[in-house]
Amino acid sequence: MKLEEKNILFRGEKISYTDVGKGRVIVLLHGFLGAKEIWETTQAALSKHFRIITIDLPGHGKSSCYGYSHRMELLAKSVKTLMDSLKLKKYILVGHSMGGYATLAFAELFPDNLKGICLFHSTCYADSEEKKCDRTRAIKLVKADAKVYTKNTIKNLFAPSNLVKNKAEVSFAQKIALKTSKRGIVNSLEGMKDRPNRDIVMNFAEYPIMMIIGRYDPVLPMQILLNQSEIIQSKYILLLDKDGHMGFLENPNACIKHLKRFFRASLKPQRKPMNIFANEM
């Protein structure tokens, strides 16, 4: 079912979003080369229980580009502008990959608005020098041939063993990614390259944090993320045993099941600290 798309102005330009369902508010933030429709399966399932807002982050989907770099703070402020326009004060943010970087920037800037966050194949650490060089090379590739770069990048985010099973999902994600403008891609690469460490945000968070980790994630190694999870005070860790960097497409049922559990536990009036580790095949 096609959802009604709405727009707000942010710094004089357009931010596109959808808003469906009733109840406590959950905001889904896509990753690099994504858009709000990447969440369609997740949104359809979760909106039966919660109010689900999806956003096209700057430079993606139908939202505008800004300047020469989309820093994570800019992304966070675009989300805050939308939530303020909807008069929403408390919510949970779910951020996939780059969306997780934006989520942590939001948590640093606006912690009082959060009831919890989920880092969906994401990290609190800044790029290593090697990774920064990779992004610089990627910018050159995009300027030379954005289509080839985009299709290959998306395909490589899935676990190799899932490429046949998830052929339709790979094609779906590539189709979305190919709509991203060259400027949007470059600005996002620049913004991710410049982001700082935000481990302190995770360590001192006064709300629960969920991490969803893929055993075969080619971008963020499983063990590094598991080690990172040790700094979280109240946590819900989901390990996807057969998946890569696109768990919501590779294993949607498991992700939806555990997201619902995390949301309900996070939204309890007198919640206790969580220490949950779940494993899904």
Where would I find each of the regions flagged by the language model?
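Short beta-strand/loop motif that positions the catalytic acidic residue
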Residues: A205, M211-I213, D217
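Catalytic histidine-centered segment of alpha/beta-hydrolase-like enzymes
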Residues: D243-P252, I256
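Conserved acidic catalytic loop of the alpha/beta-hydrolase fold
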Residues: L74-Y91
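Catalytic histidine neighborhood in serine/cysteine hydrolases
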Residues: L226-H245
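Alpha/beta-hydrolase fold catalytic core
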Residues: M1-I26, S47-F50, D84, K89, ...
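Conserved alpha/beta-hydrolase catalytic His-Asp/Glu region
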Residues: A126-C133, A144-F204
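Conserved hydrolase catalytic core segment
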Residues: L88-S128
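Conserved HGGG/HGGXW glycine-rich cap/lid loop of the alpha/beta-hydrolase fold
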Residues: L9, E13-Y68, M72
